Regions:
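Conserved DEDDh/DEDDy metal-dependent 3′-5′ exonuclease domain
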Residues: 106-109, 117, 121-132, 146-147, ...
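Metal-dependent nuclease catalytic cores that hydrolyze phosphodiester bonds in DNA/RNA
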Residues: 1-143
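Helix-hairpin-helix
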Residues: 271-325
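A non-catalytic, helix-rich entry segment at domain boundaries
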Residues: 41-97, 302-342, 346, 523, ...
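Conserved RNase H-like, two-metal-ion catalytic cores of nucleic-acid enzymes
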Residues: 102, 115, 139-143, 338-424, ...
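Acidic, Mg2+-coordinating catalytic module of metal-dependent nucleases/exonucleases
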Residues: 194-198, 207-277, 283-286, 490-567
């Protein structure tokens, strides 16, 4: 293939001023701080997150298994361009890949690709003959029109890319287009398409248009991202994420492992509080505010900004504007905003505070669950707290195993406990307080799995909805996360202080910790379960503290759904 010499540029190893095809990730996620941390963080004392309970490591291992099983089922005779991904930096990996292409192998896994003129390189999961793809997936991939060249196929252990994960799809599409550009120039034929295999599109790959021509420069958007990446990589030591916008942390991006903790430190060191700390303010709304001269939250705290029309920003409606204004007013004046307007049940005869720990469906048994890959989405831990004669009580319920039958047994025990506590006694008023809709829809899902009808008849009250819909603002809280509300309440009224553990960096780490617990001979006695229990109790005790503070602020009467007209979030609490 004539493109090999041009692809290498005469180098034996990838030079330091090239970009990997995965290098656009942080920029697409609008979080250039991650790129700065990767290349310069250690010089400034920043360290990666601990490996233990890393969700990134977990999902990376799952992705590798997904690719292996896809090959086993669809292309068992695939050959490998590289033994290890990192060998892509050596010219021998590229030479082997090109030799396999010249031999006409229909499927090549771990294909090394370089293109020196554009300073890019990378390892494609697969490159496949277009005819092989068309024969294997006749409904998704067309037969070649002329020469039978190679096209890029990447395997991603994710789902719903085409419907609800626009940023992820854009990120993966950039990778595939970069791979395709290199492949096209090496083989002398630019592919029209590349393909994404995902867990819900195993035999129906997602098509990605390449939209570049042979011998032409890289697409302008990809070139822009490449140039920015290389500038940060090569010259980023001159920048500081806490003061330079070009490498600033993106608060809207939660996929920040392995730099989650380092990024938190940087956010605390920022010269001004980021605008994205406000509810529903993302990158688009931030640009809109900056156009009006607001660079930081402090700019919005001046009295002159009190009447700013947030509804003029893209995606901000009337209710969202009211939330933002309540948060700003509280932090501007130091006063609690809106609490006197909150609609709550009166103190009930039975009040319980509940939180669930949940497993998503990504812990998959690839051997036994192929191709459905449904995993085991269950609630594995329930925390319930209450006050008994003024003394805090806490009880937890844990599934003995990571199986649906164990979840059912746990819920049967939980429902028996609720019965003893009087939750189902129609002669008594009762409420189960929680934070966010998760507990309600997870309980409904468990009811569907197990036929436990009582789960659909629980008197839930979503305290987060009380705060967000009233809306309530309190100094120190810029949003409506449980932890920040609990912390703000404790600062405002120290008698309502509730401590918070710092063992877990995120809910995703909690899931990985739970999965690790179930690998142990006695999972319920494992250190992981002990840590999760402490975290769970902090959640439910925080709920109790917030409710008591709110009742102290607003001892108003119970209103039913019809009387209030606010959608009925409180109507599930049962009046005696």
């Amino acid at each position: 293939m004539s493109g090999l010499r041009k692809a290498t540029g005469g180098y034996d190893e990838v030079p330091s001023d090239w970009m990997s095809a995965t290098g656009t990730r942080a920029l697409v996620l609008q979080d250039p701080c991650l790129l700065w941390l990767e290349h310069h963080g250690h010089k400034f004392g920043f360290k990666e997150d601990p490996e233990e309970y890393s969700f990134l490591s977990f999902i990376g291992a799952a992705g590798q298994k997904f690719e292996e099983h896809w090959l086993k089922n669809f292309a068992p005779n695939a050959v490998y361009g590289l033994e290890k991904d990192w060998d892509v930096r050596k010219v021998e990996g590229l030479q082997r890949t090109v030799a396999l292409m010249q031999a006409g192998h229909p499927v090549i896994s771990k294909a090394a690709l370089w293109w020196a003129p554009e300073k890019i390189y990378g390892t494609a999961d697969l490159i496949c003959k277009q005819s092989w793809l068309a024969e294997t997936f006749p409904g998704s991939c067309p037969q070649p029109d002329g020469r039978d060249g190679y096209v890029v196929v990447d395997a991603k252990f994710t789902r719903n890319l085409a419907s609800s994960k626009a940023a992820d799809l854009r990120m993966y599409s950039h990778q595939l287009r970069l791979y395709s550009y290199m492949l096209g120039n090496i083989q002398g034929q630019m592919p029209e398409s590349a393909y994404l295999v995902t867990r819900d599109r195993i035999a129906d790959p997602i098509r990605v248009g390449v939209e570049m021509e042979l011998g032409q420069p890289l697409d302008p958007e990809l070139a822009r991202l490449r140039d920015l990446h290389l500038h940060i990589k090569l010259h980023g030591a001159d920048y500081r994420p806490w003061q330079d916008e070009i490498v600033a942390p993106g608060l809207g991006n939660k996929k920040d492992e392995p730099w989650h903790l380092a990024k938190k430190k940087i956010v605390k060191a920022l010269r001004g509080t980021p605008l994205e700390m406000l509810p529903h303010i993302g990158a688009v709304q931030k640009k809109g505010l900056q156009a009006f001269g607001f660079e930081h939250l402090e700019d919005l705290l001046c009295p002159e900004a009190a009447e700013f029309p947030f509804h003029a920003l893209a995606g901000i409606g009337e209710q969202t504007e009211r939330r933002i204004q309540a948060v700003l007013a509280a932090n501007r004046t130091g006063e609690v905003i809106g609490a006197e307007d909150a609609i709550l049940p009166p103190r009930c005869d039975v009040e319980l505070f509940v939180d669930f720990e949940f497993f998503s469906d990504i812990n998959v048994d690839f051997e036994n669950d192929w191709p459905k890959l449904n995993g085991c989405p269950i609630i594995f831990m329930i925390g319930a707290g209450w006050l008994e004669k003024g003394t805090w009580k806490f009880r937890q319920f844990v599934a003995a195993e990571e199986y649906p039958d164990a979840e059912r047994k746990m819920f049967e025990n939980f429902l028996s406990f609720l019965h003893k506590m009087g939750i189902f006694d129609n002669a008594r008023s009762a409420a189960l307080y929680h934070w966010s809709p998760a507990e309600k829809w997870q309980a409904d899902a468990a009811e569907s799995r197990h036929g436990l009808k009582r789960l659909s008849d629980l008197p839930w009250v979503d305290l987060r909805k009380v705060f967000a819909d009233t809306p309530i603002g309190i100094r120190g809280a810029w949003g409506y996360g449980l932890k920040e509300i609990v912390m703000a309440v404790g600062e405002y009224a120290p008698q309502f202080h509730s401590p918070w553990p710092e063992d877990l960096s995120s809910g995703l780490s909690a899931m990985v910790m739970g999965w690790e617990a179930y690998k142990q001979p006695r999972p319920l006695d494992s250190p992981e379960m002990s840590t999760l229990s402490k975290y769970l109790e902090a959640d439910v005790k925080g709920l109790m503290t917030v409710l008591r503070w709110l009742q102290d602020q607003c001892p108003g009467p119970y209103h039913n759904q019809q009387a209030s007209g606010r959608g009925g979030w409180y109507a599930m609490a049962r009046a005696g």
